[in-house]
Amino acid sequence: LVLESWCCGGSPLANTHRNPLAVDKPRCAFAVRVAFALVAIPALCNVEVVAAQTGTALRGWALVETLREGGYNIYFRHVATNWSQADRVAEAGDWTSCDPDRMRQLADAGRQTASAIGDAMRALQIPVAHVFASPYCRTVETARLMQMGKIETTTDIMNMRVAEYFGGPSALIERARERLSTLPPAGTNIVLVAHGNVFRDATGVYPKEAEAIVCRPTGKGSYSVVARIPPQAWERLVAEWRSPTRALSPPQPR
């Protein structure tokens, strides 16, 4: 089962490692309206998860249930940064600098977002076994503010702009794919915090700042991209998960 997720009418996610069936947008739009009627959370745009093989729309808490079961790699692009700053890498290791005159750093709004995402993941009780981050200051700080566990830095998910220091683009892309295809310990998930360009080059999907992309690994060198979660969706997922009407709804198909 390949899942695709979007919010507020965003574009469905194209899976670059499988060939899922096309999503029936009108049918999904109708299902969204039904979900709103069942889960009465005023003015909330529900995070929808779509089973691409059947076209069946699932409410956002079905995604939460899936993540609570574990078995996924949750890839975050670092949160919002200050784009008036620029990366100035003259030699290996410069990327670890937290000096805004040398490297682009997080914006204050981004820091608040990282903390809020971490709060939401804990509220949803999504189990995390490991947290890996690119050694860039902005990715490590994002992971630290999320407070999901001990952070281990890895150059396997490095910014493509410094690929020359790590064997070139092809080598870096291959290592990123290996990370995405690695199975987490049973019943848990792995969080990776890195950059948009390496994920784009490895999968064809380009995450926005603070966006989470959920990958289901096989442990056999392959994986599938199953959901995209924009940063503003986490609060909505928590609201829906806590809704008393959730317990009254029938089990959702996987």
State what each model feature region is.
Residues C45, V50-T54:
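Boundary at the C-terminal end of the N-terminal hydrophobic targeting segment
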Residues I173-P184:
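A short, acidic, amphipathic alpha-helical segment used as a generic capping/interface helix at domain edges
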Residues G9-G10:
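Residue-identity detector for glycine
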Residues R33-N46:
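Bacterial N-terminal signal peptides
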Residues H17-F36:
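Bacterial N-terminal signal peptides that target proteins for export
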Residues Q53-T155, M160-E164, V205-R254:
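Active-site-proximal alpha-helix that buttresses catalytic centers in soluble enzyme cores
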Residues G71-N73, T188-A194:
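Generic beta-sheet signal
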